[in-house]
């Protein structure tokens, strides 16, 4: 048991150093061994050392290969944000089109994308990281989300030209004639 604890501590120290000093190398390690490593969420003795080493794709990443740590997510979090939001999906494309993700996109709030079944289970078991609570986008509180301003500005429609106005007037007149014709047929 003592040997196991010592080896675990040495491995975690090495991984912490690699994650800090050579993020690219650590991300390569993560892509190969991340699925197995995530099972470490159940190691209560080392949980505080394992959690910062977890990596996920997120809405802030340019593509599905990008990875972020929970600390990096927190560094990008909006002021007064107290949740780490996530969505479980089989792919990045599915996560992006999830209807619950729309409000987060509109408000410029980052969402972690969880592709593996163990991801969601791990975050639910961890429940918190630092002062942030893990929360699935489908369980987000609308009152909390309403506190964040929309970042996507809706494009303003260009003013209509006189020619366009004339075309709309013709269309409106045609609609009125059709509608009047329908009324006469029903009568």
Where in this protein do the model-derived segments appear?
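Conserved GHKL (Bergerat-fold) ATPase module
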Residues: 1-187
């Amino acid at each position: 048991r003592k040997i196991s604890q010592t080896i675990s501590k040495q491995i975690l120290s090495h991984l912490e150093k690699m994650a800090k000093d050579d993020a690219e190398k650590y991300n390569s390690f993560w892509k190969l061994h991340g699925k197995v490593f995530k099972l470490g969420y159940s190691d209560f003795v080392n949980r505080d050392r394992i959690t910062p080493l977890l990596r996920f794709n997120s809405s802030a990443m340019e593509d599905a290969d990008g990875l972020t740590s929970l600390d990096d997510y927190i560094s990008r979090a909006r002021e007064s944000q107290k949740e780490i939001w996530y969505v479980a999906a089989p792919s990045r494309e599915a996560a992006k089109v999830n209807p619950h993700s729309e409000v987060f996109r509109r408000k410029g709030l980052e969402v972690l994308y969880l592709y593996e079944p163990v991801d969601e289970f791990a975050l639910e078991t961890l429940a918190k990281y630092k002062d942030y609570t893990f929360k699935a986008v489908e369980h987000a509180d609308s009152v909390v989300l309403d506190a964040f301003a929309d970042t996507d500005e809706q494009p303003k429609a260009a003013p209509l030209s006189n020619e366009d106005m004339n075309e709309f007037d013709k269309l409106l007149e045609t609609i009125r004639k059709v509608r009047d014709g329908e009324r006469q047929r029903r009568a």
